């Protein structure tokens, strides 16, 4: 399937970013403000609900985004992120070779997938000989392209959440003294899954999805669990070694131990977390449980105008901000 996939050319740092998960369209429109930041002009979420496809397309056309170049971001549930040993082939043959190599690792036939590849880490630190392979079902790509058509937008690039998260981590690191040290981010991408990424030198070195079970974000953990325990209430939380809550801590510990063994020259500087309305609570709890400096992933200094709206809508829109910082000009 021939598509405007992750690309190798620099992309303009302004415009429109959209994401479609089959139920809701999230969008962010922004432009540079001349001070190294992106001014968010508007953002929002349109849910299809009970609308027919025709009714929903009409509603999307009414958003007034016609003619704008759009970048698409796929959410983690819409693709697989794999890591493989780099095939010993010329760069122009990497995708073909990777397609053959991942055939036993993907959940459907490789002919039904669109692939792209990305080097792991930064070779200035150490050559890894590894590749990330992004595998997205053609059906997911077609669906999001149909929504873009309903918006009457031209899609320039299709990007993914992992790389958007990398961009945000790197931008925050630059504002805090540089990207030479490693930074981790733990982001709740759904009610039951966290995405852990570790970056350095503006590159993605490690990514992992941690499944936590349904209802993790509604469970009593962190401050809620501690408060309930102080009042003598029975709770499912970290103080009582709840399996669901402790799984996140255990899996992060495992990933950080692996990181220390694999990349001893890149000391982990900080961990940032994002969990919507419970971000501060998650940061406090994980900082205590992990023994690391854990801070909220705070984007407002980089994106003035990203304020207002419901917490649910903001949670769907904020990852799109990372696509606005995209500058994929490397070649494999």
Predicted regions and their residues:
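Hydrophobic/aromatic-enriched cytosolic interaction surfaces used to assemble or bind macromolecules
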Residues: 1-332
